[in-house]
């Protein structure tokens, strides 16, 4: 079934065998709905950096407040800035398809957020000063959600969480840790749209995620 899902997602040219890896089951106390959403209410008018002056909407993140899987992107794009939700464009639709293929949805078992909560102008990379101002918010989200696995989507998210300025290919295929929580790094869905040859490796990453979490 997963082979067929892989073909449906990426086409026959990206077909690869599925390699099972033993999962590691972690148990953490989970927050109530009120804890994560009351935190959202307390910060959604943030003006700690210049991004707060130019945004349309603060994009806190969305999903299951008891998520096993926390996905972290780099920052909101144009559509996200207008709608106030993460990953709502073409890249978001691709991400939804990948999640569905491993038995997840953004409303069940998954929470999606970004390194910065406001759109950088012209979709540029967030500046170090902007990341610094926003990082306490992500830290608090992680503390409240207590995911079993964090997955950084793309180079910016990866190097921010790892605190290492290295190539994405050097971050992949290794389990790192963020505040004792396992952390993996994979390609951002937008990169897959620009370079379809990355889809096969990304699918392997999500197979690992599925097996790690025991889906």
Please report, for each region that a protein language model flagged, where it lies by residue:
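Conserved nucleotidyltransferase catalytic core and NTase-mimicking acidic/glycine-rich helix/loop elements
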Residues: 2
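A polyanion-binding, active-site-adjacent surface
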Residues: 5, 10-215
């Amino acid at each position: 079934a997963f082979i067929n899902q892989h073909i449906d997602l990426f086409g026959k040219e990206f077909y690869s065998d599925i390699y099972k890896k033993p999962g590691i089951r972690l148990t953490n106390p989970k927050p109530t709905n009120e804890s994560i959403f009351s935190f959202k209410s307390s910060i959604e008018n943030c003006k700690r950096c210049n991004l707060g002056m130019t945004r349309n909407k603060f994009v806190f993140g969305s999903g299951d407040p008891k998520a096993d899987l926390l996905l972290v992107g780099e920052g909101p794009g144009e559509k996200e800035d207008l709608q106030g939700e993460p990953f709502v464009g073409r890249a978001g639709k691709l991400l939804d398809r990948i999640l569905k293929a491993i038995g997840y949805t953004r409303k069940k078992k998954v929470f999606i957020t970004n390194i910065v909560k406001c759109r950088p102008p012209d979709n540029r990379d967030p500046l170090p000063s902007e990341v610094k101002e926003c990082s306490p918010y992500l830290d608090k989200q992680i503390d409240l959600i207590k995911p079993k696995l964090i997955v950084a989507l793309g180079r910016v998210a990866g190097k921010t969480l790892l605190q290492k300025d290295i190539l994405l290919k050097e971050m992949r295929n290794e389990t790192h840790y963020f505040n004792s929580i396992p952390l993996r790094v994979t390609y951002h869905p937008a990169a897959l749209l620009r370079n379809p040859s990355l889809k096969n490796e990304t699918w392997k990453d999500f197979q690992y995620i599925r097996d790690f979490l025991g889906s």
